[in-house]
Amino acid sequence: MSDFRIDQITNRVGDAGTQICGVSTFSGRSGMIIPGGSTEFRGGRGRGVFLAGYAAPSYYTSMDYVEISTTGNASDFGDLSVDKNYSGGCASATRGFSIGGWDEPGGTLLSGIEYVTISSKGGTYDWGDMWESAYNVTGFSNSTRGLCAAGYGGPTSPLGPYMNVIQYFQMATTGNMSDFGDLVHTRRQHGSNGSSTTRGFVAGGQYDGSGAASYVNMIDMITMTTLGNAISFGDITADCDGANSASDATRLVISLGAGPSPLDYGLNIINYLTMATQGNASDFGDSTSKYTSSPGTSNSVRAVFGGGRDNPGYHNTIDYVTIATTGDATDFGDLTSQRVVNAAAGDAHGGLGS
């Protein structure tokens, strides 16, 4: 065996690499790391996947994806296993999850958890089941745990139609969710929410404690690394349902949804808060148009929000903002169809750390 030094490897023209065959050894001043693991887990991160959705009377299994660091229209990713709406979404650095939901047109409350490999394209795979079946749940995660909170279980649910339950699972191992604790405020709130590596948030939602549905502005905070109940963190700037958020490691950006009665699908308000500091959210700017239920995901720089509904139409718009600044959203591109997206999942969000 002999040693040799290589500073650069090209073909004869100098515009491409060459192949090295057989058994070879290399030395270098900065070292070399050989890729390991399955090829589906290699490559750069920063992809966001929008999980199905609906535009009544049609319901979709289709998923779209974007590369968050660029701009442009979304591309087809694959399909969920069932037509459903009002599911929650969360993600690890490799997998995106769709949690629960409502089966259309079957009219069935769903407990299943499906997952995709974010760096690839294709269909979903079965992961396990929720601890308690629900739709209108909201999802969030750090690098190890996926959680969902709130929800609507229907009149036969042992936890009541509107739920305050928090559920969790380990994202590295297939299996069912377990009970985590309770929210401070009972409500339903579907979609996806941002997080830090330790804290998850549920902002806004719809509550029926008085016998008549009302929209709320409360923010609950959950410490994801432990088990236990949420605490009250503060308020967003308006009562709303259908709010979604995304984050870097320190700041949460919240796209507000539908306003209170008379039903207003026209809240184009974006809020933000510093996740380490308890308190109320502040105004960030405006979305490019007025709509509700536009799930978001992020990388370390940008948050993107896709789809949504106004009254009476549906949107395929994707907005983005730079998380560390304030200001109005900018047009990113379009989804492949106009719809309310169930949830979103990304492999570089703030809850994953670096």
Where are these regions (language model features)?
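Polar, enzyme-active/binding microenvironments
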Residues: S2-S354
